[in-house]
């Protein structure tokens, strides 16, 4: 197998390496010459499996193993102040701006994605799922389709024969439509920035070995951190070629993270967010009522955490994050009463436990210092977990702050019958939305004015998040096969915010009102203009700084 085929081959493991300009560091760390450079900090290393089926027990740093991300499920123009802006002299429709979509693809045949002259709004489409010639693609796998190829397909009687890319789930199509969809007189729909151009990446599903590592049921759709980082790299590349300002939008997330914005994807996006003419927008997540977060503190006795596991749960991974310089230990008790005993280790290590009565296999990995967050982390992976109550007894060395957090996977990776019996709805923003430099948006119901019940809540330990909220309940948008329908979730409110960010880039860069505009400046403009309830204290763990309102933002600028 040639090295350039490593990205599409199942014969390789993938790792994320940091090299600080010296690529030999990555080659030496992973003992491979197969490297894809993302930027001056990150690269992806492809390591031949050589008969190995799993990365268990291979002693790679935890932050080098790609995380798995999932989708954030999914009279709006008036609610966010866009209709008022259109009625003003600002004339903002997204002209000259691009939006990069990293999701499930797009129905490029939908009329919502064609300009008035019939040309496509999609400037480039990279479908990671369609195998092509590695030499013909920018990053060595998948297939790229240009604007010209898409428009040629649209002229055909059978467009799919020329550009065979589909959005099977409709998630990406819906979000792209909220951002850039045309006005539809029959349904009354209009995207936020209908003149915006699109760069679309359809993510391929994570490789089997990675889903196995995180104990994710094969029936769930998961996406690898490496593919997402390369998608961002691709969007940057196309935007640079076209010399256009760009919004990068991600309607995906994960719970398995430090929740401090320290993961490779988090840091890579932070670097993009600081650039002039770039806005990075994320969805806060739908974990507010999922009962997937436990926050506790070790006192004189061990802290006891109860996890209820549902029937027929395939498996799951759970992470414990503590605070340095403390060292944490776990003792895990099965529903039948079998205990692992106190699991402890040195700098890092693994322990395998089989529960005989339950036929459950447990793999515990511990890292005294996580490379990226600098904090202790214990990763517990349950294979074929028995239903019932599992007890996690947490102890520590009693040094410094003795607080800790436990997170179960996101809703889309685990059944609704598996949760913490005592949980907290706070600090539930998914990665990368808990990253300080990015724009993070929660969700509210514009019909009732209330917070969406599932909207993830703040605050992370080191940031005020979410930044604000946007409508995200029963919102109208385009669906595959030229249809329209309604969806809910913070990916919806995030897409609305991404459209608003595109209008801000048009105002700043294309209309030359703020030539230094970037993610931070857009965020601060929108925070100043957010509507706030006088009965609430801000910043607020549920609402951030309020409800986003573009018109009020411009009233505050004048």
Segment roles from a protein language model:
Residues 176-179, 188, 199-209, 236-246, ...:
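Hydrolase catalytic cores
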Residues 247-248, 265-295, 548-550:
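Catalytic cores of secreted or luminal carbohydrate-active enzymes
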Residues 315-316, 382-398:
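Noncatalytic modules at the cell exterior or secretory-pathway interfaces
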Residues 2-98, 105-121, 388-390, 419, ...:
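Autoinhibitory propeptides
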């Amino acid at each position: 197998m040639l090295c350039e085929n490593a990205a599409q081959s199942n014969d390789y493991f993938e790792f994320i390496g940091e090299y600080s300009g010296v690529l030999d560091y990555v080659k030496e760390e992973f003992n491979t010459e197969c490297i894809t450079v993302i930027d001056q900090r990150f690269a992806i290393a492809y390591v031949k499996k050589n008969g190995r089926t799993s990365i268990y027990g291979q002693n790679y740093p935890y932050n080098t193993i790609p995380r798995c991300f999932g989708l954030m499920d999914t009279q709006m123009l008036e609610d966010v102040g866009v209709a008022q802006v259109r009625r003003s002299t600002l004339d903002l429709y997204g002209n000259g701006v691009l939006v990069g979509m990293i999701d499930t693809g797009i129905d490029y045949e939908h009329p919502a994605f064609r300009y008035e002259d019939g040309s496509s709004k999609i400037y480039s489409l990279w479908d990671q799922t369609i195998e092509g010639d590695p030499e013909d693609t920018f990053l060595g796998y998948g297939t790229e389709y240009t604007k010209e190829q898409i428009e040629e397909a649209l002229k055909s009687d059978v467009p799919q024969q020329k550009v065979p890319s589909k959005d099977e789930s409709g998630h990406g199509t819906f979000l792209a439509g909220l951002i850039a969809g045309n006005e539809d007189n029959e349904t009354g729909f209009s995207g936020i920035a209908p003149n915006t151009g699109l760069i679309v990446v359809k993510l391929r599903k994570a490789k089997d070995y990675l889903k196995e590592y995180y104990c994710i049921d094969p029936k769930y759709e998961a996406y690898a951190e490496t593919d997402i980082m390369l998608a961002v790299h691709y969007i940057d590349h196309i935007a640079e070629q076209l010399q256009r300002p760009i919004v990068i939008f991600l309607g995906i997330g994960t719970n398995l993270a430090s929740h401090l914005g320290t993961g490779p994807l988090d840091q890579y996006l932070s670097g993009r967010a600081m650039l002039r003419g770039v806005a990075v927008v994320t969805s806060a997540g739908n974990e507010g009522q999922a009962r997937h977060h436990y926050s506790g503190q070790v006192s004189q006795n061990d802290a006891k955490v109860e996890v209820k596991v549902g029937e027929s749960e395939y498996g799951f991974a759970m992470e414990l994050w503590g605070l340095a310089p403390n060292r944490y230990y776990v003792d895990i008790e099965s529903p039948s009463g079998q205990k692992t005993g106190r699991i402890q280790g040195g700098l890092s290590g693994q322990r395998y436990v089989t529960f005989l009565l339950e036929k459950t296999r447990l793999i515990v990995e511990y890292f005294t210092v996580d490379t990226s967050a600098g904090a202790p982390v214990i990763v517990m992976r349950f294979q074929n977990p028995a239903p019932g109550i599992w007890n996690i007894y947490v102890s520590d060395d009693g040094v410094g702050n003795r607080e800790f957090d436990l997170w179960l996977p996101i809703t889309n990776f685990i059944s609704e019958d598996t949760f913490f019996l005592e949980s907290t709805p706070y600090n539930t923003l998914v990665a990368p939305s808990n990253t300080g430099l990015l724009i993070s948006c929660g969700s509210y119901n514009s019909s009732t004015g209330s917070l969406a019940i599932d909207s993830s809540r703040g605050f992370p330990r080191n940031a005020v998040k979410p930044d604000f909220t946007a409508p995200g309940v029963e919102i109208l948008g385009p669906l595959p096969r030229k249809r329209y329908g309604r969806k809910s979730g913070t990916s919806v409110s995030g897409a609305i915010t991404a459209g608003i960010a595109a209008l801000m880039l048009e105002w700043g860069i294309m209309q030359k009102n703020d030539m230094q505009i970037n993610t931070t400046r857009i965020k601060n403009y929108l925070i100043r203009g957010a509507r706030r309830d006088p009965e609430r204290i801000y910043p607020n763990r549920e609402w951030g700084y309020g409800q986003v309102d573009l018109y009020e933002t411009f009233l505050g600028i004048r």
